[in-house]
């Protein structure tokens, strides 16, 4: 199993959690028993870019903290399997502000949103209370395993 994050920072904020995100992604892939090579794209963007994406793809004029776009592209050949989950767009300026508002550390806020987004890429959603609770439990389990507490 190989878990890869393709990373691009287009925001003006220095990002210090990529190493942690790689650990998170690897642990999540192990816990969910995903086999083969798996990857996702992670892009940090400005608030302006985030707002444009929200308008274009969600038809809502707001600045999101994170947007997830599932792909589920699977390339399978003899003895090889590559699974591209999709793209995650994070807005660091919004996430930092949110962390302060919620009284969380920036590490906690970034990590929570990253794990939550990966589960969206894997097909989890907030369709009802039961699936919402399951997703929240999975997210918290990953964070607790890495010592990232509220």
UniProtKB/Swiss-Prot annotation:
<feature type="binding site">
    <location>
        <position position="116"/>
    </location>
    <ligand>
        <name>Zn(2+)</name>
    </ligand>
</feature>
<dbReference type="InterPro" id="IPR020549">
    <property type="entry name" value="YbeY_CS"/>
</dbReference>
<dbReference type="InterPro" id="IPR023091">
    <property type="entry name" value="MetalPrtase_cat_dom_sf_prd"/>
</dbReference>
<keyword id="KW-0963">Cytoplasm</keyword>
<keyword id="KW-0690">Ribosome biogenesis</keyword>
<dbReference type="GO" id="GO:0006364">
    <property type="term" value="P:rRNA processing"/>
</dbReference>
<dbReference type="GO" id="GO:0004521">
    <property type="term" value="F:RNA endonuclease activity"/>
</dbReference>
<feature type="binding site">
    <location>
        <position position="120"/>
    </location>
    <ligand>
        <name>Zn(2+)</name>
    </ligand>
</feature>
<dbReference type="GO" id="GO:0005737">
    <property type="term" value="C:cytoplasm"/>
</dbReference>
<protein>
    <recommendedName>
        <fullName>Endoribonuclease YbeY</fullName>
        <ecNumber>3.1.-.-</ecNumber>
    </recommendedName>
</protein>
<dbReference type="Pfam" id="PF02130">
    <property type="entry name" value="YbeY"/>
</dbReference>
<dbReference type="GO" id="GO:0008270">
    <property type="term" value="F:zinc ion binding"/>
</dbReference>
<keyword id="KW-0862">Zinc</keyword>
<keyword id="KW-0540">Nuclease</keyword>
<comment type="function">
    <text>Single strand-specific metallo-endoribonuclease involved in late-stage 70S ribosome quality control and in maturation of the 3' terminus of the 16S rRNA.</text>
</comment>
<keyword id="KW-0378">Hydrolase</keyword>
<keyword id="KW-0698">rRNA processing</keyword>
<keyword id="KW-0479">Metal-binding</keyword>
<feature type="binding site">
    <location>
        <position position="126"/>
    </location>
    <ligand>
        <name>Zn(2+)</name>
    </ligand>
</feature>
<keyword id="KW-0255">Endonuclease</keyword>
<comment type="similarity">
    <text>Belongs to the endoribonuclease YbeY family.</text>
</comment>
<dbReference type="InterPro" id="IPR002036">
    <property type="entry name" value="YbeY"/>
</dbReference>
<dbReference type="GO" id="GO:0004222">
    <property type="term" value="F:metalloendopeptidase activity"/>
</dbReference>
């Amino acid at each position: 199993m190989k878990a890869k994050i393709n990373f691009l920072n287009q925001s003006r904020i220095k990002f210090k959690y990529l190493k942690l995100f790689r650990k998170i992604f690897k642990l999540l892939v192990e816990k969910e028993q995903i086999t083969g090579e798996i990857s996702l794209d992670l892009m940090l963007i400005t608030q302006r870019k985030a707002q444009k994406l929200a308008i274009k793809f969600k038809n809502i004029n707001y600045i999101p903290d994170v947007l997830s776009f599932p792909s589920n592209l699977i390339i399978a050949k003899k003895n090889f399997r590559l699974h591209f989950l999709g793209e995650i767009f994070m807005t660091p300026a919004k996430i930092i502000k949110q962390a302060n508002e919620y009284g969380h550390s920036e590490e906690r806020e970034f990590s929570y949103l990253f794990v939550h987004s990966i589960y969206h890429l894997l097909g989890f959603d907030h369709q009802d209370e039961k699936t919402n609770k399951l997703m929240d439990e999975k997210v918290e389990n990953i964070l607790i395993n890495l010592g990232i507490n509220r």
